[in-house]
Amino acid sequence: MNQPPAAAPPALIYVIRHGEKPADPPAGATGAAPSGPPFGVDSQGNQDDHSLLPRGWQRSGALAALFDPATGPLQAGLQVPGTLLSPSYGSTAKTQEHRTYQTIQGLSERLGVPIVSDYAEGSEPALASQVVSQYSGVVLICWEHDHIPSLASSLPVTPGTAIPQAWPGGRFDVVWTFTLVPGTSQYAFGQVPQQLLSGDAATIIAA
């Protein structure tokens, strides 16, 4: 695994869900592709069930501008990330063809910061431990929504923090923020609506 130098805990950790994806197969279906359009497409425009929908690619581009605007200030509550993380799906090729990687690919290219994929979905406690013990600055994690609550609960948040126990299937438009409390090793939890695309909600995810 890629091991960055040991450093102080990150000042900020952002967690986002990947961009819009194809519909899931019908309940009970085995090995079936999504039932119909819209289809996922890879970076070359080929149909691919693991890739983003065209709207997801739009979000990917918009996220690059959200976290690194060409002009004007960043949105309140956000800073430019210096570390980008997404899940591993085995080989490098498979990882780079997956929507979690694709969602921050544009930001990676814009910043010149590689995407690190050391951990698979289901390894959230280990990922959280690595993030707080081996990274510094501002970290952005793009993850699969069913596993984001587990990741959030594995981070050292301030006592009594209410974190949503589920990420709604229809929400692709929120940034979860974890801000290091000065003088402590604990994080304050917050949420920032992205409001990047038509139809994005202005509300946060209820705890």
Language-model-derived ranges and their functions:
Residues 142-144:
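Short beta-strand segments
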Residues 4-136, 147-207:
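Active-site-proximal alpha-helix that buttresses catalytic centers in soluble enzyme cores
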Residues 139:
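Mobile, glycine-rich extracellular loop/lid and propeptide segments
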